[in-house]
Amino acid sequence: MQRIMAKKNIFTDAFGTPYFLKRMVIFILGMVSYRRFNGFNKLKISGSENLINLPDTNVLFVSNHQTYFADVAAMYHAFCAVNNGYMNTIKNPVYLLNPKVDFYYVAAEETMNKGILARIFKIAGAVTVKRTWRSEGKNVNRMVDMNEVDNIMKALDNGWVITFPQGTTSAFAQGRKGTAKLIKKQRPIVIPIKINGFRRAFDKKGLKIKVTGVQPTMEFKKPLDIDYDNESPQEILEKVMYAIEQTDEFNLLHEYDNELKNKNNSQ
């Protein structure tokens, strides 16, 4: 059965949130968080040129994940800055007056339903999903809710979407094949994002500053070259995980473990 694409509305986003409310929330959250990225700590952005001339819809950003909220907040700053012609910098927060509103991010439902601040973040563009492998700190095994997949595709039909293919803030966790299946089906332009330093600068939620003087980094890479017809979801996933530098070859501890094993085997 053919999927019906959601029609654009000049007053609301893909899920009915009024644009004026979304603009207000992005502006307030942006001003509150600004000093975290250009004051107490200095966010270093690179690769903004890879965001120029992208289409307004069906662009999927895939990123590693280090905190619940600081990662996404920093990305909002970067996208809004580029939307107003500021490349690789967030030094002039005037860009918050003209934010990119057709912008969404995939987030765990349980995270976005905890506390008033999480609910405010949700208004800014969260597309919530129930994790199939983890819930309330316990391992689970449940089926994917296809309505949630449809919501992500609806968001892509209407704008840009960020997803975190590992589904966790743990470094070098395995990628989830659902992201690759979505890519193969929806055929978006896929832009990898590599972030670093957020885990050191902020607490796990990304709300409290742990250390000042840190320079978190955010690198926007070139679009992935994907053969949507012939590459399998597993091949696409491997390409995504390598691009966001979450495979074993980027894990220094993994290399160290291998060196120890080789040393022990040779003795």
Task: Pin down the residues of each PLM region.
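A cross-family acyltransferase "interaction/gating" segment
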Residues: 157-162, 167-235
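Helix-to-loop junction immediately C-terminal to a conserved catalytic motif
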Residues: 33-66, 76
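Short, highly charged C-terminal tails/helix-capping segments
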Residues: 254-267
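Catalytic core of membrane glycerolipid acyltransferases/transacylases, capturing the structured
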Residues: 55-140
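Short, flexible loop segments at the rims of nucleotide/cofactor-binding pockets, characterized by
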Residues: 21-22, 35-42, 106, 137-143, ...
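Internal catalytic-core helix/loop-beta-alpha segment
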Residues: 127-172
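Amphipathic coiled-coil/heptad-repeat helices and related helical stalk/stem segments
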Residues: 44-47, 113, 145-149, 175-179
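A transmembrane-helix-recognition feature enriched in membrane-embedded lipid enzymes
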Residues: 2-46, 74, 115-124
